[in-house]
Every structure is written in structure tokens, then in C-alpha cells.
Amino acid sequence: MAQQIQVDLGERSYPIYIGQSLMSDSETLSRYLLKKRILIVTNETVAPLYLKQVQDTMASFGEISSVILSDGEQFKDLTHLDSIFTALLQRNYGRDSVLVALGGGVIGDMTGFAAACYQRGIDFIQIPTTLLSQVDSSVGGKTAVNHPLGKNMIGAFYQPQIVIIDTECLQTLPAREFAAGMAEVIKYGIMWDADFFQWLENNVQALKSLDTQALVYAISRCCEIKADVVSQDETEQGVRALLNLGHTFGHAIEAEMGYGNWLHGEAVAAGTVLAAQTAKSLGLIDESIVCRIVQLLQAFDLPVKAPESMDFESFIQHMRRDKKVLGGQIRLVLPTAIGRAEVFSQVPESTLEQVICCA
């Protein structure tokens, strides 16, 4: 029996389904796709694994086409976004069409942004296939592509019709990608739920061995938190900013090192440690909390230090372009306890320099 979580946004509310074999659940999918013209957007890694299965599930719904993109963060740009528009236009797809995002965070972000733009908005659904996309990027309506000068700088808030999370996809996920997803899972515990953080500490081996019950619980709890936050603050004017814990530092790492060289979750992991160390420098938390965060990230084989090649100037030039900057002030999400975080807008750059140089 699939778990269901509702993202409550009035007329734009939608369900998240979490369970096994959901990509073969034609009954659920038919509610959103029956008699529609469907374009499945996927990538060259996911297509051999799941494209035919999804096509077979949707075979009776209507016209189905697909577009297969290159795999990787380095392809999340306007040039490759255009491939989706070209596929839609070549097939004369109109406003009654639906895009299906079948893949990880890159595919979900690009498909959602394409849906937001095409003919000023068409429906799309999310079928995330990586842990990171299942617990984070597929929920909440953030869609975007990257620019060479900054991550996710060109995008829109645009909600899906439904999110289908099939946990069986994780059986084919490379270990490095699974670890990257765990960085976002751990983030939820740090910024929102201390009990969940402790549960993660106690269930490392169950999660790493892909225990179904543990995975469903972890994914469900993350989606519950994300749904709660998004329902309160869809466009990140307040509490939703807390979901960016580790991301200001992390996005700087991704941009500086070249998109795709560090996975998003790896950069977030290192960024989360830098955020915790900044909080410690400001007297917000003590060393024991930093140690718990570092130890849990390390337990999932995640990096806890920034690249040695990055100095303070490398970080700060990217952080000044961060989307959360207001009035020229860098705004950082910092933990104030396990289970709590706040946004700080006046962290001295001298403090950041000390943290980065000593990390």
C-alpha cells in the first residue's frame, strides 16, 4: 500500500505517492494522463532502465513520445532545455499536453521549467528515480537551469500535478548517488526534526543496505517536512529558506569546481559542515553538535571538507551571487540546534574567511 502525502496549496495542491512498483500503477497515473498527449523526458542513464516500463504503463492513455537527454548537472542549461521545446514543437503538442519527468533532479528541474514556459504553462508530473530527487527536488515546484555564473539562476516556481516515488528505483542507483541523496535527508533532521536526526544515526546500516521499510520511512518523513514547509511558504519568502541549509556554500563549490564534478549532495554535505562551523564560530552551537553532523555525514561516505583548491575568494565571489542575497547581504541558513535552524543576514565576512580557511 503506497503512502500518500498532500502538498496543500489550494487549487494547486497535489499528492505524493511513496511505495514499491508505483511506476507500474496505471490506475493512479491514469487520473492525470488519460486522453492526454504525453512527452516523457528522461536521460541516457535512466532510459534503458525504466523508460519502456513507464511507456507500457501509459500505453492505453493516449499518444506517448519521449526525449532522451544527456545525463549530468553539466547539461542542465538553456541549450539542453531547448531539446524539450523542440520535441514538443516538432510533434505539435499543445496546451493539453503533459510532460513526465523520469529521472533525477536535473531531469525534474528541466522538465518542470519547460512545462512552466511552454505555451505559458502545461501540466507535468514527477517520477523521480534518485534518492535526492525523491526526498527534495521533485517536491515543492522549484524548477530551473544553471548559468555558468550561478546554479539555478534561471527558473520558476511551478508545481507538478503529482509526484510518484517508486522506491524500487533505488536498487539501480549507484552508491555515490545514494550517498549524495542522504545529504539532503540529513539536512531535514538538522534544520527541522531532531528525532528524525537521531533515527538516522540509529539506522545507518539499514539505509545503506536499502532496507525497504527504512527507506520508505526516511523518504516519507522528508516529504512530510518538505510538504509542510512548502504549504506554509511556496515561494521562499520565509520558512522555506531553511531548506537551503548548506546550499549557499554548496552551490559555490558546484559552480567553482564545474557542474557535475561534485554531485549536488556532496557539495551540500561539505556546505552543511561549513554552515555548522560558522554557527559554532558565532556561538550558536557547541562543538558536540558539529561533531554529530560530521559523523553522520561521514557514516554515509559523504565529504565533510570543501575542495582544497577553493580559498575564501573562490567561495565569496559565488556566495555574493546567491539567490538569497538581499540588499547586498549574504544570507546564510545556520543550525541553532539539532532540529532547528535560522536565517542570518549579517554574518561578518571575516568570520566566513576564518571558517573557510580553517576548514
Curated annotation (Swiss-Prot):
Q: Does the keyword S-adenosyl-L-methionine apply?
A: no
Q: Where does the protein end up?
A: Cytoplasm
Molecular functions per Gene Ontology: 3-dehydroquinate synthase activity; metal ion binding; nucleotide binding
Q: Which InterPro entries match?
A: Dehydroquinate_synthase (IPR050071), DHQ_synth_AroB (IPR016037), DHQ_synth_fam (IPR030963), DHQS/DOIS_N (IPR030960), DHQS_C (IPR056179)
- Residues annotated for NAD(+) binding in this entry: 71-76, 105-109, 129-130, 142, 151, 169-172
Q: Which cofactor does it need?
A: NAD(+); Co(2+); Zn(2+)
- What GO biological process terms does the UniProt entry carry, in alphabetical order? amino acid biosynthetic process; aromatic amino acid family biosynthetic process; chorismate biosynthetic process
Q: Provide the E.C. number(s) assigned to this enzyme.
A: 4.2.3.4
* Cofactor remark from the record: Binds 1 divalent metal cation per subunit. Can use either Co(2+) or Zn(2+).
Q: In which pathway does it act?
A: Metabolic intermediate biosynthesis; chorismate biosynthesis; chorismate from D-erythrose 4-phosphate and phosphoenolpyruvate: step 2/7
Intrachain disulfide bonds: none
**Quick one: a GO cellular component term?**
cytoplasm
The record, for Pfam families, names:
DHQ_synthase, DHQS_C
Do the record's keywords include ATP-binding?
Answer: no
- What EC class does the entry list? lyase
Physiological role: Catalyzes the conversion of 3-deoxy-D-arabino-heptulosonate 7-phosphate (DAHP) to dehydroquinate (DHQ).
- The protein here is known as 3-dehydroquinate synthase
**Which organism was this protein described from?**
Shewanella oneidensis (strain ATCC 700550 / JCM 31522 / CIP 106686 / LMG 19005 / NCIMB 14063 / MR-1)
Q: What is the lineage of its organism?
A: Bacteria, Pseudomonadati, Pseudomonadota, Gammaproteobacteria, Alteromonadales
Gene name on record?
aroB
